[in-house]
Every structure is written in structure tokens, then in C-alpha cells.
Amino acid sequence: GGISVPGPMGPSGPRGLPGPPGAPGPQGFQGPPGEPGEPGASGPMGPRGPPGPPGKNGDDGEAGKPGRPGERGPPGPQGARGLPGTAGLPGMKGHRGFSGLDGAKGDAGPAGPKGRPGASGPAGARGNDGATGAAGPPGPTGPAGPPGFPGAVGAKGEAGPQGARGSEGPQGVRGEPGPPGPAGAAGPAGNPGADGQPGAKGANGAPGIAGAPGFPGARGPSGPQGPSGPPGPKGNSGEPGAPGNKGDTGAKGEPGPTGIQGPPGPAGEEGKRGARGEPGPTGLPGPPGERGGPGSRGFPGADGVAGPKERGSPGPAGPKGSPGEAGRPGEAGLPGAKGLTGSPGSPGPDGKTGPPGPAGQDGRPGPPGPPGARGQAGVMGFPGPKGAAGEPGKAGERGVPGPPGAVGPAGKDGEAGAQGPPGPAGPAGERGEQGPAGPGFQGLPGPAGPPGGEQGVPGDLGAPGPSGARGERGFPGERGVQGPPGPAGPRGSNGAPGSQGAPGLQGMPGERGAAGLPGPKGDRGDAGPKGADGAPGKDGVRGLTGPIGPPGPAGAPGDKGESGPSGPAGPTGARGAPGDRGEPGPPGPAGFAGPPGADGQPGAKGEPGDAGAKGDAGPPGPAGPTGPPGPIGNVGAPGPKGARGSAGPPGATGFPGAAGRVGPPGPSGNAGPPGPPGPVGKEGGETGPAGRPGEVGPPGGSPGADGPAGAPGTPGPQGISGQRGVVGLPGQRGERGFPGLPGPSGEPGKQGPSGSSGERGPPGPMGPPGLAGPPGESGREGAPGAEGSPGRDGSPGPKGDRGETGPGPPGAPGAPGAPGPVGPAGKNGDRGETGPAGPAGPAGPAGARGPAGPQGPRRGFSGLQGPAGPPGSPGEQGPSGASGPAGPRGPPGSAGSPGKDGLNGLPGPIGPPGPRTGDAGPVGPPGPPGPPGPPGPP
């Protein structure tokens, strides 16, 4: 065999026609959860939701334990001076005083002349008794002297010392506390406390797994309302907020009436002996003593010598007489001056805590306080799982295409994200049937006709037409006149309840307002989500039972009683007329991307669209196998950039190449700028046969929440103050009664107002793709969604022509050749080496901003994921067209078969703590009268 020398490269053949679209690739694996994104900025505060249903009254708390004795209060003010006491009883007889000392002996007088003894004189009178003194010891007996002259009356003796004061009696024991006095009047209500500190902000939870975004499906007609699902699990309780500041102390209440005096206490122990009292006043003189009897006659004396008549000295003192009898007790003296106030005694031991008194009556509500300040906006909660797609609605009329808008600025190429590992393959959904195409232009809405007949069986599915050759890009048409808005579609079925949002920060608790008159009963709204259970209240202290007053004026309706058992479902009400279209709401937060939908039927071939904007640069593919080394040529000088040649004739179909290795899925690029509006599509097909009527749906959902509260009424007149009644014994708590019988079914209610957004349910079944409507105006720019999972690998495109080496002259535009026969689909060729990135094109001029489009729906409907088309050649960066007017809604597509239930989303993070006290609920109807209480004690 000879050596094969490579010959020169032949000319490039004509470019082949694009092959038919390849079969849909296998379901892509779901990637692992991405890195948690940066927390978004807090969005604007949404409108205040309707008031929730009033909570049930909690059961009475257990009686609180008796409190500890309070601290000793400051000493009270000095009491008023007491009245003079009654005259005391006469004192006890004093003890006998001690014997007085003997008196001093007097000086002897001068001796008198001795007289002759005269006749015996009469006996002298007996002197007065001296002061009563104790008998002294007898003195020595002197010699008997001659009888002296009668002595003079002795001077009055001094009063003896007063007896010592008796010891004070023991202090009495502290008496038992008397019964509690009546409760004093309630003091005025204290000022409201200051605002509490806002609770700590809850941590942002990690976003859920991002699914691949589906294409929006057409909205179908509203189906019957499904039964309400079971209530969801109870959410975790929020963390308690920081404690609030202590409120100002209320004004001091008026003192209560004086309590009844308690019984006297038992006798106390004997006290210590008191100090000696001061001497009392001098007593009155006693009565004169009895006169003594005559003395014995003396002996005659001897005759004395007459001397000078001098007075003789007195004789020696005679013996002291015996003490006289004790005198009568003196009269009671005047009451002495009031002594100084004694210091307060030490506090006695605390008495035992008495049993708790009966509960007091509730006080009258105070005047309404000023409205509380609005709390801070709560942290925006994470978007809940994607809701189920609604059934397709009726399509509106097709508008006339508008003129092209101004050229917008060219978008920058986004950076390629990190490549994630492939996830497990998800289950493929069931494929729905494709209905026939709808009619052409829709007329103005006519009057509502009678209910139609039975729905016909859907027609057979037509075979898809052959794929036509791709036409050249046409010039954008002129912007047509905006068509009239289409008729409002029927109200869609109620979505599944959405996930509970994060509770807002704690607001200032408002004061309790005055009870208003009941407002008119509002229409019955949809049932709102069940609120979180409130924190258990603190055990209150049971107060004293107040007096029973006369019946006052009719009060405001009481709180709503506990809900009884659900009655039997009533008949389905007549469907109300569709309500007026509401104002467009603010754009909602971007929801999580849903899971990839099931592969749908291939749709009908659409009109050739304009070339899209240049996509982002794809990730570099894996290196292909190294080819044989070619001959080394001379390096030529770079030639000038040639003009873009026109498309050449299609070349012959080449042999299918060898199957290449499937590379790993590349990361999703950033979304490019919107392309110009496409041309108006063809009119739809003929109207399909009417379908058969559906089965009767399940009974409607649970009754909605009460309507809004009525306007506050004027306060009623002040009731007459009642007399104080006898304190009754607290009655025993009655047992809970049996639930009442269910009431009769009511008439169908009026169409209620739109309910608040429910919790977002699991993704519903995917409907078939509807007809493509004209492009609408650009809505507001939404928040960037989560990064989608890697898309499926598209079918490989036809092998491109091999370019000539070296710079060639610009070729003349050739005539378009006839389309060649469609060759068989080629096998995947080896992936070529990644070429260098081209230079970035110049940025286009900034286009004028188009008119603001109408507010889009809060949530788009997840469409079916179509089969991946062959990759087209990258087009040049086209100018961004202006947003076209919103086209009318197209005719409704046929209902698709129900899809499989989606997977439940991950639980959201625990939100920040909610307010401790919620807004006051609407005033409920008056409850039934309670049973009479037990009679009080007589």
C-alpha cells in the first residue's frame, strides 16, 4: 500500500436545510439546592388584611396562689387626739408604810424654881395624835419624873411618803384581724404604658429548591369549586418579643371605708414592774384624837425653899405613843395630764392568709383612649410554594398589531453561573390531549343566554403538520390601533390557601375603645386562614365580689360564642354575576420556580417569528477528540473583515456523524433583554364540538369569616348606682353543655367580597398549551427569580459548513436555491473545541420607554415544557422593540387531563414574633343568656 497524501480541501457545499425537530430529550435531573441568595430588600407594606375571625374565649384560669405578705408600709400619720378617758376606779389600798425614824431629843430648858407642891390640877387634855407613822423601837425607860405640866398641843406631823406606783399590767396580745371591709371605689385607670421594644428580627430561611420555570399555559374555563382541604399543621409559635417598658403608675384610689373593729385579744403576759411614780399631793389632816382620861393624883411634894420664880426646864420626853389607826382612803384625784404618745410597738407576727374572697364584678370600661400608632412594617416573608395553575379562561379578541416601538438599549451579557451537579430525575407527567383550534375574531359580548346543552365529546387529535423551512426575517410591521378590551372572563376557582406569612413586628397596644352599636351584617366572605394560637394569659388574682347593682341599660353585643359543630352542608348556591375588575394590585414577590412540567403534545406550527436577540455566550463544551495534525501553513497577515454574505443554497445532506458524548449541563445564563414583538399569528381553527357536562362538584367550602365591624355607636346612658348587695358565695363552674342541634340550611348568600389571599397549595395539574396570543405590553420588572435547574440538552444542529482557510474576498449574494430533500436526522457529532469569544458589540442607543402595561396577575400559570428545538445559529444583536399593546384574550383551550400531584415544598422559616395583642375583632352577635347563679348567703 502506498502512502496516502491528503489532497486539497474541496469547496464548501451548499448549506443544508434544518432538520426536523428532534424527539424530546429525557427529563432533566433536578439539581441540588442552590446557595442561599442574599436577602432581598423589604418590599412595600401590603394593604391591611381584613380582620380575622374573633378568637374563642379562653377557659377561666385556676385560682392564683395566695400572695406573700407585702413589705411593711411607712408609718401612718399621727392620729387625732383621743377623747378624755372615763374616771378611773379607786385605786387599791396602798401597802403600809415603813416606820418613821425617832425624832431628835429637844434641848433641856433652864431649871425653874422649885415651887411648893400645890393642889393637884386637873389632868391636861390629850394632845393630838401625830401623823400616822410606823411604831419605832421602844426607847430606854427613863426614871420616873415628877408629873409635869400638861404639854402643849404638838405640831402637825408631816405626811408620810406616798406609796410606790404599782407595776404596769402586761401588754395585751394583738387581736385577730377583723373581717375585710368593703372594697373601696376603683381608682381612675392608669395611663397606657409606653411602647414595647420591637422584637428581634427572625433569621432569613434558606430558599427552597429552585425548579425549572415552566411556560405559561392558557387559562381555561372555571371549573366547579373543589372541597376545602384539611387544615394545615399548626405553625411554630413565634419567639416572644422584648418586654415592654413599665407603664406609669396610676392615680391613687380613694381610701376605702373603715373596717369593723375586731374582737378583743386574749390576755397578755405580765409586764415588768414599772418605775416608781412621783409623790402624790399632801393628804388632808386627820380627825382629832380622843381625849385622854384624868391622870392619877400625885403625891404632895415637900415644901420647898421659896426661891425666885424661875421657869424650870422641861422634863425628859415621855415615851412615844402607839400609832393611831389608819385613816380612810382619800378621794380620787383629778385625772392627770395626758402622757406623751408612746413609740409604736414592734410589729407582731403576720397572721395566716385568709381564704380568697369572692370575685369582684368587672369595672365599667374606661373612656376610649387615643388610637395607637401603627406598628412598623413586618419583615417580608419568603414567597410560598407555587400555587396550582388555574383552568384556562376564555380568550379575548385579537388586537391589531401595533407599530414597532423605539429601540431600547442593548443588554449586557450576563456572567455564567457555577455549574451544579445533576440531580435525580423527576417523574414525567401524563400527556394531555390537544383540543381543536378556536374560531377567529370574537364578537362583542352578547346578553347572557340560557344554560347550554350537554358538552360534546372532544374531537380526535389531528396529526401534526410537517415542519416548514425557516423563512427570512421580515421587517417589523406598523403598530396597529389598539383593539377594544375583551370581555372579562369568569371568576377563577379559589386558589389553595397560601402559606402563612411572617408575622409583623409588635405594634403598640391600643386602648380598649367604647362598645359600639352593632353594624349591619355584612356579606359572608370566604373563610380566612386560621390564626396562630395566642400565648396563654397570666393567672389573674381573683377579686372581691362587688355589690349587685340594678339592671343597667342594654349593653353592646357580647363576643362571639364558641363555634358549634358544623351543620350539614346546604345546597349549592346560585352562581353570582362576575364582579367588576379590581384595581391592579402591587406586584407580588417573585415565587419559587415550580418543578419541570410534563412534556406536552407538540403544538401547531406558528408563524415564523422574528429573529430573537442574541443569547448569552454558552459555557465551553468539553474538548473533542484530537484530529490528525495538518500541514503547517505559512502564517498570513490578517485580512480585513468581510461583509456578511447572503445565505447560500442549501447543500446536500451529509452523512450522519458519529454520536458525540453528552456534555454536562451548563449553567443557566442571565435573562436577555426582551425581543421585538412578533407578527400576528394566524387565525384559529373552527370551534370544536361542545363537551359533555361535568359531574356535580363537591359542596362548597367552609363559611367565610364575619363581615367588617360596624361603625362604633354612641355610648349608652350612665346607669343608676345600685345599692350594695349581700356578697354571695362564688358558684361552682358549670359543666360545658352539649352541642346544639345543627340549624336549618340558610338561603344562598349574596356574592361576598373577594377574600384575602389564601395559603398557596401544592402545584396543580398542568393544562395543555393554549393558543399563542399576541405579545402583551411589558409589565413591571419583577424580582429576579431563583436560578433554574439546568435545561435539557437540545438536539444537535446540522453540521455547519467548513469555512475556507485564509481571508477571502466578500462574496456576491447568490440567488436562493431550491430547497433540497430533507435528509435523515444525523447523529450527534463530536463536540468541537471551544472557539474564542468574539468581541462585544457596541451598545445600541437607548430606546424611549414604552407606556406602562396593565398590571399582570399576581402569579402566572405554569405551562407545559415543550420539546427542545434544534439550536439556531446565533443572530446578531437586534434592537429592542417597544412594548406592544396588550392584546385581547384568546379563545379558551380544551381542558387538560389532571396531572400528578406535585411534591410538597420545604417548610418556610419561622417568622419574627407577632404582636402580643391583635386588633380588636368585629363585634359579634349577642350570646344566649347564661344560667342563673346560686343564691347568695342571707
UniProtKB/Swiss-Prot annotation:
The modification Phosphoserine is found at residues 99, 566. Glycans are attached at residue 93. The keyword Phosphoprotein applies. Type I collagen is a member of group I collagen (fibrillar forming collagen). The modification 4-hydroxyproline is found at residues 18, 21, 24, 33, 36, 39, 54, 69, 75, 84, 90, 117, 138, 147, 150, 177, 180, 192, 198, 207, 213, 216, 231, 240, 243, 255, 264, 279, 285, 294, 300, 314, 323, 329, 335, 344, 347, 356, 365, 371, 383, 392, 401, 404, 422, 439, 445, 451, 458, 464, 476, 485, 497, 503, 509, 518, 536, 551, 557, 578, 584, 587, 596, 602, 620, 629, 638, 650, 656, 665, 674, 677, 693, 703, 712, 730, 739, 742, 748, 763, 769, 775, 784, 790, 810, 813, 816, 871, 874, 892, 907, 913, 926, 929, 932, 935, 938. GO terms for biological process: extracellular matrix organization. It comes from Megalonyx jeffersonii. Expressed in bones. InterPro entries: Collagen, Collagen_superfamily. The modification 5-hydroxylysine is found at residues 93, 234, 309, 530, 641, 799. Residues 1-938 are annotated as: Disordered. Trimers of one alpha 2(I) and two alpha 1(I) chains. These protein fragments were extracted from an ancient pelvis bone collected in Newburgh, New York, USA and estimated to be around 11255 years old. Residues 57-71 have a biased composition (Basic and acidic residues). This is Collagen alpha-1(I) chain. The modification 3-hydroxyproline is found at residues 664, 912, 925, 928, 931.
